[in-house]
Amino acid sequence: MGRHVTSSPRLAIIGTSDIAMFHVDAAREAGFSVDHVAARPQSSTVDDFARRHSISNAWADPQELITKSGEWDALIIASTTESVLGLLQLAVTSGKPVLVEKPVAVHSSALHGLDLSNPSVLVAYNRRFYASVAAAREFLGAGRPALVHCEIPESVRRADEGRLVTAPVRLNSVHVFDLLNHLLGGLMITDSRLIEPGRPDNGGYMTCTSKRGDLCSISTNWNAPANFSLTIDRDGERFELRPLEIATVYRGMEVIEPSQEIPIRRYVPQAVKKIVPPDHEVKFKPGFVDQARALRGLLEGTRSPIAASLTDARVALEFAERMLGLMN
């Protein structure tokens, strides 16, 4: 059953970064009244954030805000990755809906102490809510198993002392690992390797299979001048996310005969459909409004089938760790 809340449920948020700002704007669009904000204890930014975003109550201690759960109906945790897990462990004791920023923890093993099936916790993998991703899932579900390929040209560099800085893989690439898990209904890794053993910064690949038989390859082409992308090939059609916010469906090829200007025959894929972000995804950070609506849905007794769970967060981290295990 849903909880009894006012027409504008009260939201509390922990965090004052740009991501927190996007959450505030999206939550208001979804019908929340954003009444409370906290940051790290004795934060120097929380009062200014509250003033700039017209939030009436600024808290000096995020843990105190969480324990005063009678003051709010739902909570967003958008603080630093290192602080998220402890705050979440406290927040779940309230029994109230929580939206927590990905990846939740730095290591998947840190999640083992949580109830990963807790229905009141959503993980903020906002790309699941893209119109392009919904179309990709529909495309996959409409036919036989497909051939799926994903490029992850993450920025991976070496620190001054030569150590490989892999934090972006845990903090950002996990978005793509989660998308694959979401689209294909779970994946089993069948192989993973580097291009050159001992040269992890050169990148590598993973291959996976889904339960229904889709074959998936993942290129971790670090630092390549390319967009994150995902392609699905099946029965003479290609569904492409490039960048992930925009989907294009291709069917057939146009043959352009040689000319005096270009003396070679060209084969051009024919785009038959394009899916672009709807207006509310353009005005706000893509996926955030529908994600906030999913949080509000928990108050009304409805769990979004799209939103990520803590189990999904663990799976995404395990994918990242499989690749990072080759790199370390």
Ranges and model annotations:
Residues 1-53:
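N-terminal Rossmann-like dinucleotide-binding module
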Residues 23, 53, 57-114:
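Beta-loop-alpha module in the N-terminal Rossmann-like domain of NAD(P)-dependent dehydrogenases
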Residues 32-36, 72-75, 167-168:
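Short active-site oxyanion
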Residues 110, 129-136, 144, 172-180, ...:
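Internal, well-ordered alpha-helical segments in soluble enzyme and binding-protein domains
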Residues 215-290:
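NAD(P)-dinucleotide binding in Rossmann-like oxidoreductases
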